[in-house]
Regions:
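Positively charged, polar, low-complexity stretches
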Residues: 1-115
């Protein structure tokens, strides 16, 4: 499941509520182009060294993302507005990847915040 929040939503409250519910909240911040967003995911999710910084590698890394403590993972992609405005194709690709992997996994939920 993917939740989309805009710049006028209570994004910080949403993240706090997910933490309160006991979800394993992992925040990825920003990215203004393909390279930047792949770097943001690598850093924000502490992806392994084999992560090749391409779309296929992102899919593989998200599929392999370990759930800590057996609780659901809530992947929050925050500050996604810049990529959406500067490179809509890359933004759409990231959203498609996130939705695809979330559909494949029972323990992964996604929030995209475009602020």
């Amino acid at each position: 499941m993917t939740t989309f929040l805009g710049k006028h939503s209570e994004a910080d409250d949403h993240i706090a509520q997910l933490r309160w519910l006991g979800h394993d909240v992992r925040v990825v911040s920003g990215g203004h182009d393909k390279e930047g967003v792949l770097d943001a995911f690598a850093t924000g999710l502490e992806l392994p060294d084999w992560f090749g910084r391409n779309w296929d590698a992102l899919v593989d890394a998200l599929r392999d993302l370990d759930a800590r403590h057996g609780v659901p993972i809530e992947l929050v992609w925050d500050h996604a507005a810049t990529l959406r405005e500067q490179d809509r194709r890359a933004y759409d690709t990231v959203v498609e990847i996130l939705e695809q992997v979330a559909d494949e996994r029972d323990d992964l939920y996604v929030t995209v915040i475009t602020r």
